[in-house]
Amino acid sequence: MPNAIVAAEQYREIFLNQHPIMDVRAPIEFTRGAFPNSTNLPLMLDSEREKVGTCYKQSGQQAAIALGHSLVNGPIKQQRIEAWASYVKANPNAYLYCFRGGLRSQLSQQWLKEAGVEVPYIQGGYKAMRQYLIGVIEAAPAQQPLLSLSGMTGCGKTDFLLQRKEAVDLEGIANHRGSSFGKNIDPQSTQINFENQLAIALLQHQTSDAACLLLEDESFLIGRSALPQTFYNAMQAANVLVLEESDDARLERLRNEYVHKMYSGFCERLGPEAGFAAFSDYLLQSLVSIRKRLGGKQHQELQDLMQQALDQQINQNDTSLHLVWINLLLHKYYDPMYLYQLENKSERVLFKGSHQAMHEWLDSYQTR
C-alpha cells in the first residue's frame, strides 16, 4: 500500500463508524478543536511547531523543513514513531492526518512506513474534514422536517428526547442543560468541538428512518456553546411541540437535577466536605448569574431561601427546603419568561400534551 491516501469521499464513513484517527498536529491545535474519534500524537510539540513556523516566515519552506528535521531527530524521533506504532497496533484500521493533509501527514506516514507500519493519511486533513462537518450542519434543516420541542422548565424535555429516535440532544452535546442552573461538573468543550459533535450527531440521525428531526427549543447559547447561525435560524422557524407536566412533577425533577444529582456528583469527585462546598457554590453562583433579571429584592429572597435549604441539607440530611426556592424561581422567573416566549411562537404550535400523549402524536407523525 504505497503512500495510501484516504479520499474526501470517505469522510462520511469515517465519522459514522467512528474510525480511529491519529492526529499528528501540535497539542495546541488539537486543544482548539478535534474530532471525538481522534487521538493526539504530535509530530512536533507546540514549541517545536512555533520555531518551525517562525523559520518558514523568515527563511522559507526548505529552511523550515530542515529545522523540523533537526528538532525531531534521534531519540525524540524514535519516541514519536514508537508512540504512533503503538497506537496503530491497538487500532489496526487507523488513519492519520495533520492540519491540511500536507507535509506533516506525509512525513509521519513515511517514518512509520520505514518502521514497517503502513497507515493511510486523510486527504485534506483536519481542515477539510472540519469544512465537511460545517456543511453537514448547514444542510441538515433541508434534509427532513424540523420540529422544536418546547415546554416549561422542569417538564422533562431531555428525558423525553432521549426516548425518541427522531431526536438529537443538543444539551447533551453541549454538556449543559441550557438554563441558568444548567452547568455540569465537567466543563463544556470548545465551540469548535461542540460544532463537530453536533455535525456527527446529525450525520448519525440521517442514517435512521426517523420522519423528522426533533430538537429541544433552545436559546442561541447553550451555556457558552453557540448554535451555528443558519441552524439556529431554521430552529426558530420550525413548528413547535409543547410538552406539558404537572407543577409537582416539575419541582421533583428539578430538585433531582439541581440538588441530588449535582450534590452526588461533586461529592463523588471531591469528597463529602469539599463536594458540599462546591455544590453550594454552584447553586449560589447560578443564582448570581440571573441577579439583574431577578432584581435585587427577588434575588435576595431566593438567596436566603437557598441558604436555608443548604443549611438544612448539611445539618439534617434533608433536601425538602430546596423545593421552596425552586418553586419560587419557577413561578417568578422561568414560567413568565417561557410563557412570553411561547406567545411569540403560538402560530407554529402543532401539538400540546403530556409525555404519553406526545409519544403517541410523534408515533402517528412517523407513519404519516
From Swiss-Prot:
Every copy of the Rhodanese domain together lies at 15-138
Which positions are catalytic residues? 98
Q: What's one Pfam family the UniProt record gives for this protein?
A: Rhodanese
- So what does this thing catalyse? 5-methylaminomethyl-2-thiouridine(34) in tRNA + selenophosphate + (2E)-geranyl diphosphate + H2O + H(+) = 5-methylaminomethyl-2-selenouridine(34) in tRNA + (2E)-thiogeraniol + phosphate + diphosphate; 5-methylaminomethyl-2-thiouridine(34) in tRNA + (2E)-geranyl diphosphate = 5-methylaminomethyl-S-(2E)-geranyl-thiouridine(34) in tRNA + diphosphate; 5-methylaminomethyl-S-(2E)-geranyl-thiouridine(34) in tRNA + selenophosphate + H(+) = 5-methylaminomethyl-2-(Se-phospho)selenouridine(34) in tRNA + (2E)-thiogeraniol; 5-methylaminomethyl-2-(Se-phospho)selenouridine(34) in tRNA + H2O = 5-methylaminomethyl-2-selenouridine(34) in tRNA + phosphate
The EC number(s) attached to this protein equal: 2.9.1.3
Q: Which terms in the Gene Ontology molecular function aspect does this entry carry?
A: transferase activity, transferring alkyl or aryl (other than methyl) groups; tRNA 2-selenouridine synthase activity
Q: Does the keyword Transferase apply?
A: yes
Q: Which UniProt keywords apply?
A: Selenium, Transferase
Q: Which GO terms describe its biological process?
A: tRNA wobble uridine modification
Per the record, the coiled-coil ranges are none
Q: Sorted alphabetically, which SUPFAM superfamilies does this protein's record hold?
A: Rhodanese/Cell cycle control phosphatase
- What is said about its interaction partners and assembly? Monomer.
Tell me which family the UniProt entry assigns to this protein.
Belongs to the SelU family.
Function text: Involved in the post-transcriptional modification of the uridine at the wobble position (U34) of tRNA(Lys), tRNA(Glu) and tRNA(Gln). Catalyzes the conversion of 2-thiouridine (S2U-RNA) to 2-selenouridine (Se2U-RNA). Acts in a two-step process involving geranylation of 2-thiouridine (S2U) to S-geranyl-2-thiouridine (geS2U) and subsequent selenation of the latter derivative to 2-selenouridine (Se2U) in the tRNA chain.
Name this polypeptide is given: tRNA 2-selenouridine synthase
